[in-house]
């Protein structure tokens, strides 16, 4: 479910039936998210690690910005920490505000087409190279808009993912 938000940015409300933690005074958490695209035009999805909110849901890798970090710096740090990859070029692409029950999150999506290193799942997560429609389930709500944008760019028609049951 989406709604209007300040400055023309849309708001995606995840699990709208659940109560929001922190009420109206919640701060927005900025997150850098990497859309790693390989030579076969597949993108990388990772499962959320054990013990985290939305455990085992599939998402694009990334993490929270630390104080005084740019999106590019945060993404570079997070992908090295979580996946063991050194990224070369970050293209800031799109932004989506997501109202999760546990947090209000501004997702800063970046395309990454060049990196060094081998994938290492350093937080106990799984990974899958995917194309549309994605075959992994369940997909994190904040990931769904990206799948739609990728479909629009590539001319893909049809469901981008399987709905969670």
Go through the PLM ranges and name each one.
Residues 2, 42-81:
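Conserved Nudix-box catalytic region and its N-terminal flanking loop in Nudix hydrolases
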Residues 14-43, 64, 95:
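Conserved N-terminal beta-strand and adjoining loop/helix that marks the start
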Residues 38, 86, 95-119, 126:
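Active-site-adjacent beta-strand/loop module that shapes the phosphate/pyrophosphate-binding cleft
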Residues 82-89:
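Short secondary-structure junctions
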Residues 111, 119-154:
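NUDIX/MutT-family hydrolases
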Residues 151-165:
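Generic C-terminal helix-cap and adjacent flexible tail
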């Amino acid at each position: 479910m989406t709604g209007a938000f300040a400055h023309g940015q849309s708001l995606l409300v995840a699990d709208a039936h659940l109560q929001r933690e922190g009420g109206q005074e919640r701060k927005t958490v900025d997150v850098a998210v990497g859309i790693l695209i390989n030579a076969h035009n597949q993108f990388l999805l990772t499962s959320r690690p054990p013990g985290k909110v939305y455990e085992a849901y599939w998402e694009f890798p990334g993490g929270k910005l630390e104080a005084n970090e740019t999106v590019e710096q945060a993404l570079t740090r997070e992908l090295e920490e979580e996946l063991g990859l050194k990224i070369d070029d970050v293209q800031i692409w799109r932004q989506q505000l997501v109202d999760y029950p546990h947090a209000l999150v501004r997702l800063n999506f970046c395309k990454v087409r060049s990196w060094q290193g081998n994938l290492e799942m350093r937080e106990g997560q799984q990974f899958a190279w995917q194309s549309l429609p994605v075959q992994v389930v369940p997909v994190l709500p904040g990931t769904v808009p990206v799948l739609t944008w990728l479909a629009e760019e590539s001319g893909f028609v049809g469901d981008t993912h399987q709905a969670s049951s």
